[in-house]
């Protein structure tokens, strides 16, 4: 993207679909107030929108949030939130991004970026493969090129999240050690917030009939100050008086027996 092969971003779609139902006992331990049982449907958005923002260098300026209803297969495991969420972002150049996350019935990390001179996308069934199409001088002409990118550091090949766990940590440590060469590959605190705050404000949008919410640029002190005491979230220990529930189902509270059963499965090594 930074070479300009597909031009300026117009629209992107990104998915981090991870049906966690089978592993829910081993990652929540039957704890009612485990953060995964308290998060909203759109909270876990960095894995989907992060690569788009990092590749393009663009900042999100507005978000609308949507969620599915809370499905029984997750509620029976102690999760009361909407079982999947969607964010629609507007970026600073006017581009639109659609992000889909969480417990849909497949496991996939998929990205497609449409530029004004071409398109690039990951393969839906072979996550290691990339497809790129560049426009020629005449409109609607061009060829597809498909290839499998190689790791720049083979030590990443065994790391989680497609090598991302290795690279983000490695570059972060290198930067702390004073290696300026890795600066283009590191994520600073403002970029990190840009990748996660759409999920927080996206849930505010969901609670307000999916209305668009402006995303602050926290690099600017005036915009930071406007949000300094805003603790709105679904985590009671952090939100204080601004706490909102992640359960919009209208159903009765999940009984203690559910969490006891999930804890039993965890200790027994049984799936969800």
Predicted feature residues:
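Glycine-rich phosphate/pyrophosphate-binding beta-alpha loops
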Residues: 46, 95-109, 161
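A general structural signal for well-ordered alpha-helical segments in protein cores
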Residues: 48-49, 169-170, 199
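Predominantly a Rossmann-like dinucleotide-binding segment in NAD(P)-dependent oxidoreductases
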Residues: 1-79
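C-terminal glycine/acidic-rich active-site capping loop/insertion
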Residues: 32, 54, 62, 72, ...
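Active-site beta-strand termini and strand-to-loop segments that position acidic
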Residues: 80-82, 87-94, 113-115
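Short arginine-rich
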Residues: 198-208
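Glycine-rich beta-alpha junction loops
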Residues: 14-20, 67-72, 93-95, 103-105, ...
